[in-house]
Amino acid sequence: MSDNGNDNEDSGKLLYCSFCGKSQHEVRKLIAGPSVFICDECVDLCNDIIREEIQENTPEGNGDKLPVPIDISATLDEYVIGQQDAKKVLAVAVYNHYKRLRVGDKKKGKDEVELGKSNILLVGPTGSGKTLLAETLARLLNVPFTIADATTLTEAGYVGEDVENIIQKLLQKCDYDVEKAQQGIVYIDEIDKISRKSDNPSITRDVSGEGVQQALLKLIEGTIASVPPQGGRKHPQQEFLQVDTSNILFICGGAFAGLDKIIRDRSEKGGIGFSAEVKSKDGSKNVGETLKDLEPEDLVRYGLIPEFVGRLPVIATLDELDKEALVTILREPKNSLVKQYAKLFEMENVEVDFRADALEAVAEKAMVRKTGARGLRSIMENVLLDTMYKLPSEENVVKVVVDDSVIRGESAPLLVYGNSESAVAVPED
């Protein structure tokens, strides 16, 4: 190996990289081989090229290693607590979808049976894990993934986002590689917010409700979407990227507030006549249990048009998270909040100790706010804000203790100093 200032046996002879032609004085390192030399810059460039090729070929290379439903569900268990029924539905639907893409295409022409696409609808309360389930699936399958907010969508020609912007976002996630985008996953959040405003047609055009549902129909079912290259604006002389959406898996999610009442009304209606089944009102069921009885007709009554419901044949319902589930979410998943804060404090060489009663108090606060798991981080951030602000300036702190009184705002976190047996509370401002 030759360095910039190397003047041993090659004293007086200037060495050059055989690839880029730079001299030994222009680079940090020059590696010698049999009659050839390569500099550190060319080595880095070669590594980048090889890394890009490996990433590009990963989906094809893993084509025969598609995870089976049990493995998919097990991976979801690492990140999402509970929701076993939803995980099972998702695992089977996703497995069949990508099996259709990876195996079905190889047999095209030999078999006349054409497998249809099974898009998915997730129905569950806010903070129950709908978005996290979709994100984890995309990461597991190593496919492009994007999240779209249905509330920002409008019909083409109106102020707001065009539905084709969804495909543009997906392309951005994979550097405008059309082939990769065509096997991606799109999660459309807040899908319940585009329900039509009333059952009766109105003179006033519903551009953000039924109009958006109509616009999404073809996109979800499968069409050729024209997308401007590199996110430019559309104009007549421009060449568009043509993206076939027939192999893109669409997962729609929404809280559907009030849907449980529609389900109860339907299930409590009795028939007419002597043979009619008499049904009594069951007020003991919670929202999650009621949603398990969901039928497509309930979604139509809620405000989704029948054609749109038909494009989402796989329906998975998520349970409302109780206190025990929220405590488990705080502690057990791979990326749990307790583990994340432990890592943050570890960077300051400080141990953080969340007592069991503290985690229960956090869960209780989240239940009062009705934000599900989504509200847990906000509560933790507020509690630890002052400590994280002052800790980098403190010396000899080895441990921070958080109990239920800290969560309730009755006291500050306890700081334990290494040079003293005493524990000193952080003074409140």
Curated annotation (Swiss-Prot):
Zn(2+) binds at residues 17, 20, 39, 42. It comes from the Bacteria. PROSITE patterns: CLPX_ZB. GO terms for biological process: cell division; proteolysis involved in protein catabolic process. InterPro entries: AAA+_ATPase, ATP-dep_Clp_protease_ClpX, ATPase_AAA_core, Clp_ATPase_C, Clp_protease_ATP-bd_su_ClpX, ClpX_bact, P-loop_NTPase, Znf_CppX_C4. GO terms for cellular component: HslUV protease complex. Keywords: ATP-binding, Chaperone, Metal-binding, Nucleotide-binding, Zinc. One of its GO terms (molecular function) is ATP hydrolysis activity. SMART domains: AAA (SM00382), ClpB_D2-small (SM01086), zf-C4_ClpX (SM00994). ATP binds at residues 125-132. Pfam families: AAA_2, ClpB_D2-small, zf-C4_ClpX. Residues 5-58 form the ClpX-type ZB domain. Belongs to the ClpX chaperone family. ATP-dependent specificity component of the Clp protease. It directs the protease to specific substrates. Can perform chaperone functions in the absence of ClpP. Component of the ClpX-ClpP complex. Forms a hexameric ring that, in the presence of ATP, binds to fourteen ClpP subunits assembled into a disk-like structure with a central cavity, resembling the structure of eukaryotic proteasomes. This is ATP-dependent Clp protease ATP-binding subunit ClpX.
